[in-house]
Amino acid sequence: MTLKLNSTENRCVSTSTIGYMCLALTIWMVSMTNAGWYVRVYPHFAAMIMPMAVVLGVMGILSHLRARSLDAVVFFGGGILFWSAHAAAVAAAGPSTMEPLSYAGWFFAIWAVFFGYVWVGSFHTTLPRQLFVLGLALSLLATALTDWTGMPFLRYIGGYIGLISALLAGFVSASGFIAFGGEAHSPNDEHLGQTHPAG
């Protein structure tokens, strides 16, 4: 099965614009808590994280169909990370036994390794995208180290790295919107008229 992309599908804002803004908003919300601005994650963030994960999944699919592999991997990875974080928060709110922090550290370490590999794979793209993915990996690593060592200053460092990463994601999103929002084409037009396998 193939998917034929035509110009009518590419007249709106690009998937990168929506996906990176979704990442920016979600990472900003969680990083405010990690940076010590708030003492815990509040219900409004818990209510926001699942819809953002779904939007990232949709943007990942659309990016894949437009042969934008880095964006697809970042959006799928972010969506799955947020989905699993929401599932962990729901499980922790239930009557189950609390997991040891060292175990939670492994959760964040695995995601840090994942985004570290994505960062290495992003060397062919723009510097803001590279720095965003690197910042996300370092923020997750700092959270893992906090859970392993019990040193709260590492969480604060990770929180501020996360806030900077959120600003970088917002910059990537805004630059795509500014560069292509008013034109008759978008970054998705680079594959205009080409046939791509859909499976």
Regions found by a protein language model. Give the residues of each.
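Cytoplasm-facing juxtamembrane segments at the starts of transmembrane helices
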Residues: L5-M21, R68-V74, F123-L138, L154-I161, ...
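Structural signature of hydrophobic alpha-helical transmembrane segments
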Residues: R40-V54, T97-W111, F132-V133, Y160-L163
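Membrane helical hairpin/interfacial module
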Residues: L56-A89
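Alpha-helical membrane segments in multi-pass integral membrane proteins
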Residues: W106-V120, L127-W148, L154-S175
